Amino acid sequence: MSNHDPISDMLTRIRNASQKKHTTTSIPSSKMSLSIAKVLQKEGFISDINEEGEGYKSQIILGLKYSGKNKFPTIRSMQRVSKPGLRIYKNTRALPKVLGGLGVAIISTSKGVMSDRDARKQGIGGEVLCYVY
């Protein structure tokens, strides 16, 4: 089955797995998915990233994080912003702050995929892929 929006598929898989309190989830491997996963790990939303398989069957296994005795998901919400039908680009001054800085906007820039904080520090804008909080 072809997937027309692999980023939305990735976000949905993570959202569903965290709601069911799974410890890991697998997503089809791509450079963009791996870049987004690395940003999520750097920002503390996921615990680990492992790649399995080769070629078109390769998968990325993400370790999900939970907090507290009742295992509340670290990722409360993930929202896709820029979609294949409507791309959203922002310059440095217009980059959004998610929940007043508590959340993260993941930005695809000319220097790679990074969080909104890193993009502001480097003074570059780009395509706003998603919000995570």
UniProtKB/Swiss-Prot annotation:
An example GO CC term for this entry is: ribonucleoprotein complex
Which terms are listed as keywords in the entry?
Ribonucleoprotein, Ribosomal protein, RNA-binding, rRNA-binding
Q: Which domain of life is it from?
A: Bacteria
Q: Which GO terms describe its biological process?
A: translation
Q: SUPFAM superfamilies in the record, alphabetically?
A: Ribosomal protein S8 (SSF56047)
Disulphides: none
Role this protein plays: One of the primary rRNA binding proteins, it binds directly to 16S rRNA central domain where it helps coordinate assembly of the platform of the 30S subunit.
Protein name per its UniProtKB record: Small ribosomal subunit protein uS8
What organism is recorded for this protein?
Prochlorococcus marinus (strain MIT 9301)
Which gene specifies this protein's sequence?
A: rpsH
